[in-house]
């Protein structure tokens, strides 16, 4: 679940097509990923993406063809700025 409050602005730094799907890398800049683990969700321009790799200064996510067909993600390019929000946890203050 997300609040809709943007925590940081990141940047798309890599796009790797895989069949009809896509793997993308987001550089997070000022977003603290210290509490993020593989499998966590991060809203990226409002699209809920699951973290599959954590290289240190960002994250990788796999995007299905269904997500590509039903969001604006297909139009994202390397260099596209994206709004970021980590998913809420049971301990998150609202």
Give the predicted meaning of each segment:
Residues 1-94:
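Conserved loop->alpha-helix
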